[in-house]
Amino acid sequence: VERDASSQDSFSWPADPSVLYMARSTYKRLCLGAVSVPYAICIWKSWALLKCKIFAWLAVQHRIWTSDRRARHGLQDRPSACYTCLKEEDNAEHILVQCVYAKEVWHTMFDALSLQANIPDAQDHLLGWWLAQRARWSRDAKRGFNTVVIAVIWALWKQRNARVFNRTNQQLNAPELASSVIGELKE
């Protein structure tokens, strides 16, 4: 680097030469090329607990440890059946939206909260269904709806895990689970 001792030093900010420094230009420079995830706001801007948000983030990316994921990673021979209905494969989509028990919980929850939302059907995927239902709400109501969705999928996951790890066949029925979720939401 050659320096000219006869000229005065000057300060400039390469991200935005018109100004000396701005946090906004630094942020933009650091995030250049960052991937935009359209569903991130659904999760991270909700009122749900952090552990529930983290679970939802993993669930929509199919990164929760269901038996199909363990089988894909060679941790078990083959996927096992859903621990709730014993009919379909134990995977994230089935546990959270496609299982008969999950549908009953969604229906009960929406009725209890008087929410006008469609219950997921057999072909729905969590993220697609969630984004479609979310689009029906006003800007202010979306945050509340997102919180309800996250709370319900967290409760369904906890019910599934109680059966898997506690080896119990007892589970809360849909009204009991919905009541439990509503109680947690009020806290």
Model region roles, listed by residue range:
Residues 1-187:
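Charged boundary/loop elements
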